[in-house]
């Protein structure tokens, strides 16, 4: 599909083209969904002073999501996406940003994806999953020029984030006084950020690690629900372990 949107008096346009497709095997055991988008928007100068009120934009997105049923009771899911985006505002948009009077410019490249495995027992009393995901961002930027050398306003930022974990759920037909679901899980998350503004002699280089574990039990029937649990988090920039208790009470006066 393609859409065109006029801006202002209609001499500036925002063009967007999108595509998607899905494929599923005859036995329903595997499938693939593909998506993509391309967008182009020209800069809009409302009052004709040579400075944009709305920046120009170029962007592309493409990705897919797929699944494979490895057995009757298990499934593997994989997804990936890639995004590119360029934005530029100010004046003299056809010149390098450091030659403009005012310029704000960013260019992003993002790659991300995830992998997940799900399993449940034939009687559905046991449910188990393992997952992992990651995303990398690279951004080139310019904000200036301001009162300093115009070449000082260039910067670059990179960020890599990934996480992995597992979760297990056991369903009790009756635990003490009513049916319940016991849930336990672990997670690990790491974020690596590097931000450079060379002209200002500013650099941020930071790595954050967070390890987590949680346990909860939820009793529930048609009218009542009780949940008791807790979560432990260890942050590498904090000396002590953080404990977060959790408790909820639900009452539904009418039957579903």
What are these regions (language model features)?
Residues 15-19, 30, 60-64, 109-115, ...:
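Hydrophobic, lipid-facing positions within transmembrane beta-strands of outer-membrane proteins
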């Amino acid at each position: 599909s393609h859409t065109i949107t006029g801006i202002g008096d209609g001499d500036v346009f925002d063009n967007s083209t999108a595509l998607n497709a899905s494929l599923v095997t005859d036995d329903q055991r595997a499938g693939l969904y593909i998506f993509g988008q391309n967008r182009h928007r020209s800069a809009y100068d409302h009052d004709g002073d040579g400075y944009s009120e709305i920046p120009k934009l170029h962007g592309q997105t493409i990705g897919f999501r797929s699944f494979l049923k490895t057995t009757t009771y298990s499934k593997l899911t994989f997804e990936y996406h890639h995004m590119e985006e360029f934005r530029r505002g100010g004046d003299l948009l056809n010149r390098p940003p450091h030659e403009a009077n005012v310029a704000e410019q960013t260019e992003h490249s993002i790659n991300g994806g995830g992998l997940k495995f799900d399993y449940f027992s034939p009687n559905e009393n046991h449910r188990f999953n393992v997952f992992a995901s990651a995303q990398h961002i690279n951004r080139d930027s310019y904000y200036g020029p301001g009162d300093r050398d115009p070449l000082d306003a260039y910067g670059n930022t990179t960020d890599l984030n990934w996480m992995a974990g597992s979760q297990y759920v056991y369903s009790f037909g009756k635990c003490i006084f009513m049916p319940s679901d016991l849930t336990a899980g672990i997670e690990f998350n790491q974020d690596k950020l590097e931000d450079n503004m060379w002209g200002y002699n500013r650099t941020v280089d930071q790595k954050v690690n967070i390890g987590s574990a949680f346990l909860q039990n939820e009793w529930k029937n048609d009218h009542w629900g009780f949940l008791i649990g807790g979560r432990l988090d260890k942050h590498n920039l904090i000396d002590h372990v953080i404990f977060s208790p959790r408790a909820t009470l639900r009452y539904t006066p009418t039957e579903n």
